Amino acid sequence: MEPPPPLLLLPLALLALLWGGERGAAALPAGCKHDGRARGTGRAAAAAEGKVVCSSLELAQVLPPDTLPNRTVTLILSNNKISELKNGSFSGLSLLERLDLRNNLISRIAPGAFWGLSSLKRLDLTNNRIGCLNADVFRGLTNLVRLNLSGNLFTSLSQGTFDYLGSLRSLEFQTEYLLCDCNILWMHRWVKERNITVRDTRCVYPKSLQAQPVTGVKQELLTCDPPLELPSFYMTPSHRQVVFEGDSLPFQCMASYIDQDMQVLWYQDGRIVETDESQGIFVEKSMIHNCSLIASALTISNIQAGSTGNWGCHVQTKRGNNTRTVDIVVLESSAQYCPPERVVNNKGDFRWPRTLAGITAYLQCTRNTHSSGIYPGSAQDERKAWRRCDRGGFWADDDYSRCQYANDVTRVLYMFNQMPLNLTNAVATARQLLAYTVEAANFSDKMDVIFVAEMIEKFGRFTREEKSKELGDVMVDVASNIMLADERVLWLAQREAKACSRIVQCLQRIATHRLASGAHVYSTYSPNIALEAYVIKAAGFTGMTCSVFQKVAASDRAGLSDYGRRDPDGNLDKQLSFKCNVSSTFSSLALKNTIMEASIQLPSSLLSPKHKREARAADDALYKLQLIAFRNGKLFPATGNSTKLADDGKRRTVVTPVILTKIDGATVDTHHIPVNVTLRRIAHGADAVAAQWDFDLLNGQGGWKSDGCCILYSDENITTIQCGSLGNYAVLMDLTGTELYTPAASLLHPVVYTTAITLLLCLLAVIISYMYHHSLIRISLKSWHMLVNLCFHILLTCVVFVGGITQTRNASVCQAVGIILHYSTLATVLWVGVTARNIYKQVTKKAKRCQDPDEPPAPPRPMLRFYLIGGGIPIIVCGITAAANIKNYGSRPSAPYCWMAWEPSLGAFYGPASFITFVNCMYFLSIFIQLKRHPERKYELKEPTEEQQRLAANENGEINHQDSMSLSLISTSTLENEHSFQSQLLGASLTLLLYVILWMFGAMAVSLYYPLDLVFSFFFGATCLSFSAFMMVHHCINREDVRLAWIMMCCPGRSSYSVQVNVQPPNSSATNGEAPKCTNSSAESSCTNKSASSFKNSSQGCKLTNLQAAAAQYHSNALPVNATPQLDNSLTEHSMDNDIKMHVAPLDVQFRTNVHPSRHHKNRSKGHRASRLTVLREYAYDVPTSVEGSVQNGLPKSRPGSNEGHSRSRRAYLAYRERQYNPPQQDSSDACSTLPKSSRNVEKPVSTSSKKDAPRKPAAADLESQQKSYGLNLAVQNGPVKSNGQEGPLLATDVTGNVRTGLWKHETTV
């Protein structure tokens, strides 16, 4: 075979070369990608721009260089797990320009690791674990332009690290531990010399340089001076360890390595710990990790009881020291426990769990969003309370100081106490504190008083300044308010921090500072404290008499003898005052309309020198005399063991005001100088002792001593004492077995309780009567609701007044009493107004005709609307008042009763109550005028039912005009209310009048003092009795239905027979054209109109059934025998005038004996026929037939009959209502009378009749009927029966016994 020609071998060689190159380029590690992008033309240019990406492949080491293309330009090895770069890791990649090693685990870079990368321009080592770097690491990177070392562990960079990087222009080395100290001073010079840009690199430590650019920090701030701040320093475990004897416990300590002389030492309770195998303690020497951390370990292999204590890791350098500690608690195998316990204090409610002995338990403080920043430890997690359980299993020390106060008052006062004060804001802050201490009576925590005492001391520093003149006045007012606090709270505050003594001493300094500023007289007064100060000369001093008094109204002077008993605290909101003159008698001090609280006589010898040689100097001396009077002894509580003192171990109590006298200035010996003091007692007791208060007794707590004092004179209310030196004077008495008469504990006069109980019993009788006998009492549903609610709210007012008006001792109870009185009073006058409006609507109501009879009637208005007015409006008013400030209710400091503050009561009570009362009076006047204009309107009648309304409309054309003067005959069962409008008006108006008078007399009885309180108590009792009698007579005794209901209940035997009411001798005939009057009786008879002039004879006859004949026979024959007189004409609700269109009550029309209707019965509505036949069938079992329904058979039946008859009549009525659609009846006050929606097929009559139509009876009356005295009598329901142009009056039938008959097709017998 011949060899191939040379020309053919050349193409084959080129193909082999290309195939080999492509093979080499494709031989990459699994997962790596080769990216070649040509920027020019030619295959060589594409290969030179090669890019290899080996990212996120979990590579543990750098790929061998021989696995990568020799012409690789960019190598991406990010997001792997490479931990070390060895020497020559990238040899052979001489064309590599970019190397990305981000997000690996590189902790060590060997010298020469980047050797051979002479073309490398960008190197990224971000987010690795590099702890230290040196110059050999970057050897060979002569062309490197950009280097990023951020996110590593090193704290600093040593000088010379970048010496081999001659082309470097951009550097970034931000880390979390970067320490800007003296070790990076070289970088400032190197950056400036090489013109290098340092990007996004800021200091982290020390804290003073945090967030400042490294190259922007001033060089003088880059120091290595103490204190030492370590970027990283931690000890594990870091929290308290609780272990048992014999356990093993390892510790490890690690810190940032910043200096070569760093050492790590271990300590126990301040003693250095070294390895001791006998005790099982092993200490490892300090070791350096990754050039950035220094670490040491301690192991306690056999823990004993002596291991309990504080163990610490101590880092020591020449730049300073730093320590981390952990507490170890070693328990015995049989350790005890502290039991779980609940602790409630002024910091909150803490529930301590069961805790091992020797352990300190911690609990989070109660969270409170307000004022959290003013407590130590701003973070909520740092605010914890702790409590230690000792080794005996008992709770020991505790600390709640980091927790906020749970009470709002205490928390606000604490905020006041933390406010910085200066001359500018002192007065304003004092005024704010004064406004807050007005409610000092509600202080419940001793810290409240302590904080106020501390604030008064702070204010006292500024009383010397001329700009703070009024500061002293405000301080006295604040101290006066503190005297309103409870004695127990003041006692605890005195024992805890001597708060009361500090307040009194601050008040003494006020006068001293004011007189020192140049003033000759200074005085300030408050309700409980009076302060007076003078600058006096010894020369010419002849003595001084000063009196403390309080002005009172002239009306109160009659009660001076009883004043002390009624008002021990003197909280009349009237200031105490001083009156002084140069005299030793009281003759010139009598002031009109004042109460003398105390007086003091200073003798002329007070300022006299003892020796003659001192006389001349003493005459020219100036003295500062100050007098302070306290209304009571609350600021002088004895807290220590005072058994041997004047109070005899708290057996005696201060019962008089306290008056303080002090002289400042030149040295004066005030001992052995008799001072007479007269004091008014505010309580009665025994074993009186005159005493002085000494601030130095009982280790500075203070106490009363009786040395040098005696009682000169004493009567019921006044005690005069004499003491041998100046000081604080008072009288102490034993109150054991006696009562300190306070307004909170006072009782009302017995006549108030007696008469109030009478009123309560009468109101209960009315309420029970109307609720128990509701179905038997003739009263409308609306009036019933109004009366019951009115009586209930009067009863509520009386009960709360009598039982709670003086309960001022408990603030919450007192507030509740004020709220209930506020509500019940407004509700009472509102229910009177609702009642008056209802009467007015009934008096002026007119019948309204609906425009569209096919439209269904409007639904009835709910009874709830009255409750929304009578009860809802007072609830809203009280709710708004209480929500605005609950302290609007309760006892005022000046009032011994529970009510409201004066200002809020004007808008929340007196204003609304006066307006509602005025509106009520306007309603009463309007009703009175209407009744005078229309005397015929006397009674409220029942609202007609739907059937009655239609029948009334059909009968409207049959009224005889010739007898227009005749009035309707009305049965008493058609009355909606037994009381006439005039009687209802009288009842409502007198109820309101008596209630207002009763309220006023009660208020006077509790607010005035003797003897006026006694007078108004008797007035209150008289009004109570009158009110009781009126309510019983008007609503019970004067009402026949209520009397009968009680008689039937008390005497059940009397209910077996019927009782005739309003029966008069019957009239045999009518006179003057009037129909004979009739009403219901026990026989429940009907009457017909016998007037011949009212009707004409009919020209046609009417077919009568046997039922109708029997009824006609009964009316014509029985009337003269058993007729009852008709009600007075005034019983009609309104006149029948068609022009006035007044609403007509349901009237029972008598059967017309000669009815001549012209009706086509075939045209009667089938629906009506079916309904009426149903009624007929239902009554077939109960109603007598034409034979049995005669008068003779019907009369002997009694009204009660049997329950079976009543049940059958009710079933008949309900059956009729079920088949006949009947819309709900509208409210009588606002509804319009409408016709039923059912079919009304009426055919016009062909003739008229002059006689009366068949009688009509309302469905309601049929339901009430219990006696069937004669045959069935159904009303005509299919249209009016036309008369001959004249209208006859509607006559009343029997209301309780008769079922009417009408004209029926095929009607014979039942």
Curated annotation (Swiss-Prot):
Residues 28-70 form the LRRNT domain. It is found in: Membrane. Residues 572-739 form the GAIN-B domain. Residues 769-785, 837-865, 930-985, 1035-1310 are cytoplasmic. Glycans are attached at N70, N87, N148, N195, N290, N321, N422, N442, N581, N641, N676, N717, N810. It is a multi-pass membrane protein. One of its GO terms (cellular component) is external side of plasma membrane. The chain crosses the membrane at residues 748-768, 786-806, 816-836, 866-886, 909-929, 986-1006, 1014-1034. Residues 1222-1239 have a biased composition (Polar residues). Interacts (via PDZ-binding motif) with DLG1. PANTHER family: ADHESION G PROTEIN-COUPLED RECEPTOR A3, G-PROTEIN COUPLED RECEPTOR 124-LIKE PROTEIN. This is Adhesion G protein-coupled receptor A3.
